[in-house]
Amino acid sequence: MSVAAAVTDATFKQEVLESSIPVLVDFWAPWCGPCRMVAPVVDEIAQQYSDQVKVVKVNTDENPSVASQYGIRSIPTLMIFKDGQRVDTVVGAVPKTTLANTLDKHL
């Protein structure tokens, strides 16, 4: 069971853009090997930063509108949103330290 909540095209605005705290969005798909590799890292980040950051996942197969809106061409893509704006992007399966360092810049 993932620690990160699933977000859809319908709930993206409310859950991500209108969030009062920074949001880490994991764009993924079930068939994507690297996505499965980075999933435990995303869950660890969600637990480690639970009081500072909201972590959500968007299945790009089921929610193509949001993926298209943000120009997702490769997955996994992890985006950080703050005050309704995208402030950073990490593409690919990256180590936890890389993701944590990127996140720390925006807290």
Swiss-Prot record:
Q: Name one Pfam family in it.
A: Thioredoxin
| Gene Ontology cellular-component terms listed | cytoplasm
- UniProt keywords, alphabetically: Disulfide bond, Electron transport, Redox-active center, Transport
Task: Domain (Thioredoxin): give its ranges.
Answer: 2-107
Q: Which GO terms describe its molecular function?
A: protein-disulfide reductase activity
Q: Which domain of life is it from?
A: Bacteria
Return the SUPFAM superfamilies for the record: Thioredoxin-like
Main function: Participates in various redox reactions through the reversible oxidation of its active center dithiol to a disulfide and catalyzes dithiol-disulfide exchange reactions.
In the record, the note on similarity to other proteins reads: Belongs to the thioredoxin family.
User: Could you identify this protein by its name?
Assistant: Thioredoxin 1
Q: Which organism is it from?
A: Synechococcus elongatus (strain ATCC 33912 / PCC 7942 / FACHB-805)
